[in-house]
């Protein structure tokens, strides 16, 4: 992902290990390692614009055997997606703090409501 405009950060981590934070700004390049969980956060006052380059086309759907399968399926059901209510509380705390530091409101509250 190439950041074209805006400021924020990405969280990246392999299953069962510590979350690592990487701050970004225009010109930054973010490349999550294969098989790692990752999230991207706009914590600034301006919209973020980015160019996401990825595998997953018809030609490269199974590059390195990882594919995109189950990216939208909950990890509890064998997928690769961590639902908001199941994420590490540190993720939400970090975003709340980043928004407060930038003087912006966290607009994600409605998505954190338990289903």
Protein language model annotation of sequence segments:
Residues 1, 29, 39, 49-50:
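Beta-sheet entry/capping signal
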Residues 2, 14-34:
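Short acidic-glycine-tyrosine-enriched beta hairpin
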Residues 41-115:
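Double-stranded beta-helix
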């Amino acid at each position: 992902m190439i950041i074209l405009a805006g400021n924020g950060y990405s969280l990246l981590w392999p299953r069962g290990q510590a979350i690592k934070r990487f701050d970004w700004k225009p010109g930054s390049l973010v490349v999550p390692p294969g098989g790692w969980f990752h999230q991207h956060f706009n914590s600034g006052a301006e919209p973020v614009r980015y160019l996401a380059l990825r595998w997953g086309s018809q030609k490269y759907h199974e590059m390195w055997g990882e594919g995109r399968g189950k990216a939208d399926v909950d990890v509890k059901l064998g997928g690769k997606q961590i639902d908001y209510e199941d994420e590490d509380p540190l993720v939400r705390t970090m975003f709340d703090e980043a928004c407060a530091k930038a003087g912006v409101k966290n607009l994600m509250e409605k998505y954190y409501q338990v289903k």
